[in-house]
Amino acid sequence: MESDFIGLFSLLGLLASLNFPRLTMEKNMTPTDETTVAFIAEIGETSRYLAARNDLYASVMIAQAILESDSGQSQLSQKPLYNFFGIKGEYNGQSVTLPTWEDDGKGNPYHIDAAFRSYGSVENSLQDYVEFLEGSYYVGVHRSKTRSYKDATAALTGVYATDTTYGDKLNSIIEQYQLTIYDTY
């Protein structure tokens, strides 16, 4: 039943994306912005649905997907991997090893090779992200434990990602693309 709802929201997102090229041209957006707007249209409604059902901010979920996947353009986010959130490990026994950059917690980047989850579908990626945040380690990102999305992004900094400016980057994306509209139900 839930997969039917996710499929419906994916379809709604696809239909909504048909209007975005017209809107982006009117706003004189760059090609990068147009790519991001199309990516938001692809995952926005499903993210809204999943976030609402799981005490999360859809705006943060979408901003993380934009940042972690380069608006769905990174190698890791492409078919058949669909890892929009940079989640390491395995998903149903599936993973891929790729080079990545980490932050030592003091703003100094370093390179590692890491195994990342491979999902096989957009829906699996979004659903697994929600499940990934269910543990007590991420309790500070839940709506019921925060006053705003900014509290949630602050709770992710240094925890979800080693980047010491992670929350600031997410806040900037949320504001630039007005993602808080996805936090309403």
Model-derived segments and their meaning:
Residues 2-185:
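Catalytic cores of secreted/periplasmic lytic hydrolases that degrade extracellular macromolecules
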